[in-house]
C-alpha cells in the first residue's frame, strides 16, 4: 500500500512539472494571451483612507498610563521604568484606581471576581 502511494505521488509530480513546462513554453512563444480582468477597475481604491487614532489602546498595544488602556481592569505595564509600555491585564484594584484617576476611558463599573467570596 505504501509503495502504491509513493508511485502515485511520483507520477502526479511528474505530470505537474510537465504540464507547467508546456504552459510556460506556450506563454513565452506568445501562443497564449494573458488573461485580462475586466473588473479590475471596479476594485481599485480611489483614495486610501487614513487610519483614525483610537481613543484607547487594546491589550498589548503601546500606552503612556493606565487611562490609555481600553478595558476596565487593564493597566499600563512598563519595562525599565517608563520604557516599552503596553496594556496588560490588571485586577479589581486597577479598576478602582482608574475610576478615581481617569477622565477619559473611565470605567463605569468594576467587575468583582466570585472566587474569593465566602458563602454562608
Curated annotation (Swiss-Prot):
It is found in: Secreted. Belongs to the neurotoxin 05 (agouti) family. Residues 1-16 form the signal peptide. The presence of a 'disulfide through disulfide kOR' structurally defines this protein as a knottin. Residues 17-54 form a propeptide. Keywords: Disulfide bond, Knottin, Secreted, Signal, Toxin. One of its GO terms (molecular function) is toxin activity. Residues 56-95 form the Agouti domain. This is U13-lycotoxin-Ls1b. Contains 6 disulfide bonds. GO terms for cellular component: extracellular region. Its main location: secreted. Expressed by the venom gland. Disulfide bonds join 56-70, 63-76, 69-87, 78-85. It comes from the Eukaryota.
